[in-house]
Amino acid sequence: TDFDLQATISRLFVYPVKSCAGVELNEMLLTETGLEFDRAWMVVDANGEFVTQRQIPRMALIKPQMKHMEVVLRAPGMLALHLAFDRVEKPVRVRVWKDEVAAYDMGDIAAQWFSDFLSEPGKPQTLRLVRFDPEHRRLSSLKWTDGVEALNQFADGYPLLVASEGSLAELNERLAAAGHEAVGIERFRPNIVLAGIEAHDEDRVDA
């Protein structure tokens, strides 16, 4: 059924390093792979396999800050790590789920920073930080995009994740009724948060 949405964008988030904390911004360039710099970097293990909070929950403590020509990463007990937008090192091949993806290694300093912070005491890990190769075309699963060719970088599935304040409010009402604490929108790692629409109307948007 046709319907009109009078929605406004209330919040914008990017997640420069896959599975690390996001950063809220007032504006961001929309590109064919999603918001600029979203999931542009990723942590991989010694075999080039992607690493996420599913294996290492401490990744959530790594907080980015976007500056003019760099992203700055901070974590408890660590010196800040500065990643220049225009700096990469050798080309590598890495894996995200079933996809083999072209990327660039970000060098030994970044690798040591992530290895030091994310390793458990007595269990050192060899981790590397890589950046997506912009010449590589990684398609979202056509099964989930209804046949539309949607490009993304290191995201799990889609160029953008859209949520709404209405859906969050409805969820928190149900949580409260069940005796649970409310959750914030950050729990769902959206890129775009919409205001002014009913719960779950974002699922009906044909963009």
Task: Cite the ranges covered by each PLM segment.
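Small-residue-enriched flexible connectors and coil-helix boundary/helix-cap motifs
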Residues: 1-207
